[in-house]
Regions:
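Short polar catalytic/cofactor-binding loops
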Residues: 13-18
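Alpha-helix N-cap and loop-to-helix initiation/capping positions
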Residues: 22, 26, 58-65
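A short, N-terminal amphipathic alpha-helix
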Residues: 25-41, 67-80
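Active-site catalytic loop in hydrolytic enzyme cores
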Residues: 88-160, 173-181, 185
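Short, acidic/polar
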Residues: 22-33, 148-155
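Beta-strand-turn-beta hairpins that frame and shape the catalytic cleft
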Residues: 2-9, 132-141, 164
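CN hydrolase (nitrilase-like) catalytic-core segments centered on the catalytic cysteine
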Residues: 63-82, 149-194
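Active-site beta-strand/loop signature of hydrolases that rely on acidic residues for catalysis
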Residues: 9, 31-61, 81-82, 147, ...
């Protein structure tokens, strides 16, 4: 990315509810609002489809089915969607983030550091690698929520070529000041956009 490149990014703040279908429709509504302000990229929260409501986990469909409405809108409109999702693969469930562009899932990251205080490892399988994704808007690395607390993860993404680090999260509102400091620290330490 050069200093003259401009990218409009919309952070879709959404209250995650116990109803999976309502969450997906709300996410779609927020994407449509991002289109109104001519966003290039819209970022949905961590596990935006299910939240951490365990009763939702059993009904999670394969990604292409779970995210069919998002795939469709990204195909029709010129917008990249980065969404935190509960992803099912066989019997395993992952806390993942996907990059959707032009009707396709063009990148997928599975959370490697599961949050111990909420027993994520009891429900989700950990991912096994960091990745940087080449996109029309630059090289994007992804972490998910709790992983912002590990500076070495951001550093590794930058060493792998990341110019932007996206961190979908479901971070508690009560600690939002803490969240902002963590994001600023990762940006300053690595001299990249977070």
């Amino acid at each position: 990315l050069s200093i003259s490149d401009k990218i409009r990014v919309t952070l879709a703040q959404q209250r995650i509810l116990p109803d999976r279908e309502v969450n997906i429709m709300k996410g779609l509504s927020l994407i449509k609002r991002a289109l109104q302000v001519k966003a290039n990229i819209v970022i949905l929260p961590e596990v935006f489809n299910t939240g951490f409501y365990r009763h939702n986990y059993e009904s999670v469909e394969p990604l292409e089915d779970e995210l069919s409405l998002l795939l469709k809108i990204s195909e029709q409109k010129d917008i990249m969607i980065i969404a935190g999702v509960a992803e099912r693969e066989g019997d395993d469930l992952y806390n993942s983030a996907v990059i959707i562009y032009r009707g396709e899932i063009t990148g997928k990251y599975r959370k490697t550091h599961l949050f111990p205080l909420t027993d994520e490892k009891k429900y989700f399988k950990a991912g096994d690698r960091l990745e940087v994704f080449e996109t029309p808007f630059g090289r994007i690395g992804i972490l998910i929520c709790y992983e912002v607390r590990f500076p070495e993860l951001s550093r590794k993404l930058v060493k792998m070529g990341a110019e932007i680090i996206v961190i979908p999260a479901e971070f508690p509102k009560e600690r939002i000041d803490h969240w902002r400091v963590l994001l600023q620290a990762r940006a300053i330490e690595n001299q990249v956009y977070v």
